[in-house]
Amino acid sequence: MIDAEGYRLNVGIILSNDEGRVFWARRAGMRSWQFPQGGIKVDEDPDAAMFRELYEEVGLERQYVEIIARTKGWLRYQLPERFIRRRSYPLCIGQKQIWYILRLTGTDANIRLDCSERPEFDRWCWVDYWHPLSDVVYFKREVYRQALSELQRALQAGRPAGAQAVSDAGGTATRQIPVATEPSGPSSSQR
């Protein structure tokens, strides 16, 4: 669904694990990585769209996640000129998104990238909370910064004040440190 200004209504999903790391996925057949996201259909509310996209792209059903929070309003990004399809109607110039932060209550084994005819992703990993800012395609970076910044407080609410677990290379939580305010490096555990 595209609004009157040319923005496609969309949901973005930040899936976190118990260690405060986030799900990061590589687009099928490409080198780019991103959070799961997808369009909102006509007569579909954002929550329903989020659960549908979560299943289609990540294979997770609602019983395997907990909604922690969502952004208060819409976050927007504009597509670079070369990605705008001028001959399509209605014209889409970008995305207008509600972002969610979820906690995985199931296990990594519940994540399946093959739940749709054309999978969106072909690989995934857990990364440090701020890592996506250094890795996402440039035109989505500001929206990612806004979503991560707004939703960080909600994620921290269930943890010791100002701390998140940090994992060693084996994926075991080793210590508590203050939550970083700057992007940090990638995870070593990739699927």
From Swiss-Prot:
Its EC number is 3.6.1.-. Residues 6-149 form the Nudix hydrolase domain. GO terms for cellular component: cytoplasm. A motif (Nudix box) lies at residues 38-59. InterPro entries: NUDIX_hydrolase-like_dom_sf, NUDIX_hydrolase_CS, NUDIX_hydrolase_dom, RppH. It is an enzyme of class 3 (hydrolase). It comes from the Bacteria. One of its GO terms (biological process) is mRNA catabolic process. The keyword Transcription regulation does not apply. Keywords: Hydrolase. Residues 162-191 are annotated as: Disordered. Accelerates the degradation of transcripts by removing pyrophosphate from the 5'-end of triphosphorylated RNA, leading to a more labile monophosphorylated state that can stimulate subsequent ribonuclease cleavage. PANTHER family: M7GPPPN-MRNA HYDROLASE. This is RNA pyrophosphohydrolase.
